[in-house]
Amino acid sequence: MGGFRAVIYYLLAAAVIALDQWTKWLVVRYMQLGESIPMIDNVLYITSHRNRGAAWGMLQGQFWLFYLVTVIVVAGIIIYIRRLRPSERLAGIGLGLMLGGAIGNFIDRVFRKEVVDFIHTYIGTYSFPVFNIADSALTVGVILLFIHMFFFATPEKGNE
């Protein structure tokens, strides 16, 4: 699917990137590394944290691996968006969120050599790993894509 509908998903990705980069800029500009501001005591904090790895700090310092994987994933998402049918809006929204999240963290890796994380939540006494807007968009995007695939996807004609 080219045209107007694809543009909507790219605009969604651009909005995610803008919000992600703006919030990270605020954290870097106005908070000390390790500083934590309670939003809801024992539940939600804004905590200035840096991550040189993948989700939850895995694969620390493997920059070239992240660069390569991100370029491949972004290209795949763009190809998938272009092939969507007009009825596959949920998949398009999921892919737009994933695209924005992937590019948001990629920008950090390229320009900062680390990812700025700042959303720190607790589930009971469990301290969930610190994350950011891009991570959230990626997670929600993957969930939406799975919902689409398992509940709404229909086989293309000729592939049944």
UniProtKB/Swiss-Prot annotation:
Highest taxon in the source lineage: Bacteria
Give the matching InterPro entries: Peptidase_A8
**Molecular function terms from GO:** aspartic-type endopeptidase activity
Annotated pathway, please?
Answer: Protein modification; lipoprotein biosynthesis (signal peptide cleavage)
Q: Which UniProt keywords are listed?
A: Aspartyl protease, Cell membrane, Hydrolase, Membrane, Protease, Transmembrane, Transmembrane helix
Q: Which residues cross the membrane?
A: 7-27, 61-81, 91-111, 133-153
Membrane topology value: Multi-pass membrane protein
Cite a GO CC annotation. plasma membrane
PANTHER family per record: LIPOPROTEIN SIGNAL PEPTIDASE
Its protein name is: Lipoprotein signal peptidase
Naturally occurring in which organism (per UniProt): Geobacillus thermodenitrificans (strain NG80-2)
Q: What is the lineage of its organism?
A: Bacteria, Bacillati, Bacillota, Bacilli, Bacillales
Protein's gene: lspA
